[in-house]
Regions:
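C-terminal alpha-helical cap of glycosyltransferases
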Residues: 285-306
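A short, well-ordered alpha-helix in the C-terminal region of glycosyltransferases
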Residues: 265, 272-286
Length: 306
């Protein structure tokens, strides 16, 4: 992985694997380097996850020396050249992967949602012990929704305990710290949080970017307002909203003040929040990573028996 990714993963207390660093090189040379590493290490599967990897990059990774899997959200970036496509959204079957990866194994749907182990070992989901409003807008929050939402909560003198979570790539720490110091709200701030599950199981309502964190919120049965900030978040988030445990809004359609008004309205309806919590509890928490590995292993075994 790149130097930036190494820094992020190296700070994780739950990172289990050795890291193979990619030295500084032209991006066009990366696929050849990766293929060489996989061949030398006798790798069974190479898994690619990232929006920056285009069709040409993926094509260069396709090899008869190892299998190639890609994580995907929308199937909107051309041919995938993959032996396996992974998409944990329940409605991923509508994406038309038969056109862009006609020979690929499809690890798609809720059975393949990937969660860290902390979300598979939850012990306390008691509703009566939840008190906090949690605000989290992903690893970097490029549109500064954390600041805008917190400022709006300050303007209306919100009274509930508030937890702010910022990701490792968040660049507004100085400004956020100043705002927290200068407002009179009851705020706890976690930066690069290492134990998200313990925070979310104590959350009564979350305002969250509608990315992969929605699967973590669901696992913790946390009622949520999911804010769509990117097109690739729409499909999975619409499916989540249909399940009844969250509400869905689009960042382009409302201001931070309007978002906070919706939040306060929901907060003042404890029976509705409890109902959303119970609907989340009815949905199974699946070890999607284990199911993916099983599918990969079965495929390798079948290939070796040919």
């Amino acid at each position: 992985m790149s130097q930036g990714s190494q820094h992020f993963c190296g700070n994780r207390t739950d990172w289990p694997a050795p890291i193979l660093p990619i030295t500084d090189m032209d991006k066009s040379l990366e696929p050849e380097w990766l293929v060489k590493q996989c061949t030398n290490l006798r790798t069974d599967w190479l898994v690619l996850d990232g929006y920056q990897f285009d069709q040409a990059y993926r094509q260069s990774l396709h090899s008869n020396k190892f299998k190639f899997a890609v994580f995907d959200d929308m199937n909107n970036s051309g041919a995938l050249f993959a032996d396996m496509v992974i998409n944990g959204a329940q409605n991923a079957g509508l994406n038309g992967y038969q056109l862009t990866a006609p020979k690929a194994l499809l690890a798609i749907g809720r059975d393949y949602q990937v969660l860290r182990q902390e979300f598979l070992q939850l012990t306390n989901l008691k509703w009566s012990e939840r008190n906090n409003l949690t605000i989290m807008f992903g690893a970097s929050d490029p549109t500064k929704l954390t600041l805008l939402t917190l400022q709006s909560l300050h303007n209306v003198n919100a009274s509930m305990p508030i937890t702010i979570i910022t990701g490792a790539a968040y660049e507004g720490l100085h400004e956020l710290t100043d705002l927290i110091k200068n407002c009179n709200l009851h705020i706890t701030h976690h930066h690069d949080c290492q134990d998200m599950a313990s925070v979310l199981v104590n959350t009564k309502l979350a305002i969250s970017a509608a990315g992969g964190s929605q699967f973590e919120l669901l696992a913790c049965a946390t009622p949520s307002i999911l804010v769509v900030v990117a097109d690739n978040q729409k499909n999975a988030s619409q499916d989540a909203a249909s399940q009844g445990w969250c509400q869905l809004v689009y960042s382009d359609d409302l201001s931070a003040d309007e978002l906070v008004m919706q939040c306060l309205s929901l907060w003042q309806q404890p029976e509705l929040l409890h109902s959303m919590h119970k609907k989340a509890l009815q949905l199974p928490v699946v070890d999607g990573a284990l199911n993916i590995v099983k599918l990969m292993s079965e495929n390798i075994t079948a290939s070796n028996n040919l």
